[in-house]
Structures are given as structure tokens and as C-alpha cells.
Amino acid sequence: MSLRILAKRSSSIWMKTRVTPALISPITITTRFNSTTTTAPSHKDDVRPVDPKISKIVQDISQLTLLETSSLINELKTVLNIPEISMPMGGFMAGAAGAGAGNVPSSTGEAGSGAEEEAKPEAKTVFTVKLDSFDTKTKAKVIKEVKGLLGLSLVEAKKFVEAAPKVLKENVAKDDAEKIKKTLEDLGAKVSLE
């Protein structure tokens, strides 16, 4: 059978099974194009005039590079006197959110108990885990554990361990940091928490 005959047959079959626009109901078309599940809702009715000053700031910020944005954030934190809050690797902790709010005025207008909090030394809850050294006899086990902790390849983990002293993880919660330290010390490594 030649290609020409095969093409004619497949084209005639396609023409017979093709759905024409007249066969599609108008309900299907309107449902498809008016569906809110696939498109974002339109807020054209709720458009408020934007101050040109704000519009210009938005335009300028949206054109910044990542480094420029980081500089902007740091400068705003300095100018607005916003404290640096470090988040642990495990995620959001409710205690960490309230820790920086000691001197913020309450809804009654009273200042927080900032003097009382400054008198008590704060217990450190976030640590940096540092691999100081390791026992050469258990080097392979330490490499395997570091590989699992950091998600590195075997070669990367070997280079990492051999470059000790080196920081393993930063901003680790106290419990996790102690677990990592105990695990690595059981394998013959010397680990410090900072």
C-alpha cells in the first residue's frame, strides 16, 4: 500500500470523527471560558487609584537585582530599627516570634518588660554545629554520617570531613544540634556547638 492511499484513508477517517463547532453546546463553551478554577479572579471592578509615588517605588523595587534587594532590606532594617530574627532550620517556632517583641508597646500603650528581660541571660536556642576533628580509624563512618546529614555525594562528604574544622550546619534548634553532636561524637568525631 502506498503512502498516498494511506494518507487519503486516514484523512477521510479523521474527517468523519472530527467534532465540528456546531456539535459543541454553548453551555460547554461558556463554562470553559467562565470557569474560575483555572484562572485568577479579575479585580477590575475593585481597582483603586494608586498614588504615583507608590507606583514609582513599586516599579523601582521590581527592577532591582537580588543583591540590590538584599541591600535594600538590610538598609530598611537599619533605618526602621527592626531586630534581626534568625529562624531555625526546623521551621517557624512560636517562641521565636514572641522573643523579639519584648519592647513593643502593647494594645494598652504600655511598654513591654524590656528591663526584666535584659537582666536575665537568654538561653540560646539556635546553634551552629561545627566539626572540629575526627578519629582517623572511624573516618569512613563520619563521612557516611556527614553525607546523610548534608545530602552530599560521597566525594563531597569526604572533602568536607577532610577540611575539618568546618561548620556542618547553621541555625539548628538546640535539640537537633545536640542529637547531631552526640551522633558524630559516638563515631569518634569532635563536634562543638556555637
UniProtKB/Swiss-Prot annotation:
Compositional bias annotation for Low complexity: 105-114
Sorted UniProt keywords: Glycoprotein, Mitochondrion, Ribonucleoprotein, Ribosomal protein, Transit peptide
GO biological process, one term: mitochondrial translation
Presequence boundaries: 1-33
Compartment annotation: Mitochondrion
One Pfam family of this chain: Ribosomal_L12_N
Major location category of this protein: mitochondrion
Residues listed as glycosylation sites in the UniProt record: N34
Superkingdom of origin organism: Eukaryota
Modifications after synthesis and translation: N-glycosylated.
GO cellular component term, pick one: mitochondrial nucleoid
Molecular functions per Gene Ontology: mRNA binding; structural constituent of ribosome
Disordered: region residues: 101-120
InterPro entries (UniProt xref): Ribosomal_bL12, Ribosomal_bL12_C, Ribosomal_bL12_C/ClpS-like, Ribosomal_bL12_oligo, Ribosomal_bL12_oligo_N_sf
PANTHER family: 39S RIBOSOMAL PROTEIN L12, LARGE RIBOSOMAL SUBUNIT PROTEIN BL12M
Quaternary structure annotation from Swiss-Prot or TrEMBL: Component of the mitochondrial large ribosomal subunit (mt-LSU). Mature yeast 74S mitochondrial ribosomes consist of a small (37S) and a large (54S) subunit. The 37S small subunit contains a 15S ribosomal RNA (15S mt-rRNA) and 34 different proteins. The 54S large subunit contains a 21S rRNA (21S mt-rRNA) and 46 different proteins.
Further comment found in the protein's record: Present with 6900 molecules/cell in log phase SD medium.
Entry's family note: Belongs to the bacterial ribosomal protein bL12 family.
Function: Component of the mitochondrial ribosome (mitoribosome), a dedicated translation machinery responsible for the synthesis of mitochondrial genome-encoded proteins, including at least some of the essential transmembrane subunits of the mitochondrial respiratory chain. The mitoribosomes are attached to the mitochondrial inner membrane and translation products are cotranslationally integrated into the membrane.
Identification of the protein by name: Large ribosomal subunit protein bL12m
